[in-house]
Amino acid sequence: MNYKLYWELTNEGGARLLRAFGETPEPRFPAEIEGRAITEIGDYCFAAQAHLPAECRCSYVQAETEADGAPETAPDGEMQAEPETDGAPETAPDREADVMPGADGTPGAAPGADGALAELAGAYITRVTLPEGVKKIGNFAFYNATELAELELGSGIDTLGSDAFMNCRSLSRLLLHAYPGQKTGLRLLLAQLSSDLEVALSGENGVWAKLLFPEYYESYDEIAPAHIFGRNIVGEGFRARQSFREDVLDFAQYDKIFPQACVDESETTLGRLALDRVRYAAELSEAPRGLYEEYLKAHSGYLIRRITDDRDLELAEDCCSRKFLTREDVAACAMRAGEADWAEGAAALLHLMQQYFAEKTPDERYSFDDF
């Protein structure tokens, strides 16, 4: 994957990414630029408005793929800005023919048949993978990235600028590279994201924990005539976001929100939260596990809708194996799949019904004629 990256040196000798152009709305950025580790994301880097400094470097980079080795910087000296001998950065190049930037601060156009690169900013980007070594995300870094749905990054974030995710209305998933017990920058990220957010923690063997942080709202009421404002918080998502101990995620504290959440939150929110905890049961003790499982068994209708709406047979088998669904539930799920013209799902669900539940008498058996 080819990228054109504008950047500058940090005081520590790393690279601060300022602006990026690429071939896909789901960029996966390299770890280095010209041998410099990318450690910072600059102010407004992925925002719809460009805020490049007067002087910065520009490099063409071929990013690493699963089949390739380490990322390489384009060797052509005419396409790659080199630092001056005195170490001072070069002036940022003018807009070039191979880049299709947006007008009036809007995101760049999508890559065209001529190989043009799109400006990776604003509404164009949908999923971003930041380099593992990034420690700082600048002010308004993702401002007005309205279609950004998922962000993948390492555990080392220790500085997050003001309103880094302002107007990122579609951002609903974080994939964080971390191992159990590790300090992360998740608390900082959650403090700026108040909408529903599913966080997956991934290590060498894949995802080992998945948590839903529900949406919450804040409001302030003036207490007249002293002009004192009272703070009101609605939603258990706020308490969930406090489940940290010295920047380490505290699963036991997180699990304590569920009883009150059952009073305040919707069935969809509670179902997602409970499923994530029992399917990725990191540090899950028996008492909260029992509460989650009891809730799911009592709300099989949610599971049926989710299986058929998402067409998720893996979830269906998981629910059968954990006895969250009864034989009648699976039959209803198969019926709903048939009504949705999901023939493959209906057949698979009937197979699961036979596999996990004892057959009834011949008169009670279901057949494809029922669907």
Predicted regions and their residues:
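Structural signature of tandem-repeat unit edges
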Residues: 2-14, 21-39, 51-72, 76-80, ...
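Extracellular beta-strand-rich solenoid/capping regions of secreted or surface-exposed proteins
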Residues: 41-43
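A cross-kingdom feature that marks long, compositionally biased intrinsically disordered regions
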Residues: 284, 288-303, 326-329, 339-341, ...
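Conserved hydrophobic site in ankyrin repeats
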Residues: 318-320, 349
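Charge-dense, extended regions
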Residues: 335-371
